[in-house]
Amino acid sequence: MKIVLNKCYGGFSFSAKACEALGLKSRYTIIARNDERLISLMEEYGSEWVSGDLAALVLVDIPDNCTDWEMDEYDGWERIIYVVDGMLYHA
């Protein structure tokens, strides 16, 4: 499963171009991090095109066989914690 995370301090936000492509009114609109449209934009245009000010959005791939996942955040910097076969991992 692919998920979009912010990998810098500051916070998750979109560029004006990404907002327009996604039909969002605000750079700070919350959408599912595994939204197919968002994943497609990241794959087609890349992080710099999609990321807003003070954001460095990245595409993270976690195993499809994970049984649970959760996003962890500190001051805008995010990571995914997920479970596979009863073991915890992070990305």
Question: How would you label these PLM feature ranges?
Answer:
Residues 1-91:
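Catalytic phosphate/metal-binding cores of nucleic-acid and nucleotide-processing enzymes, i.e., regions
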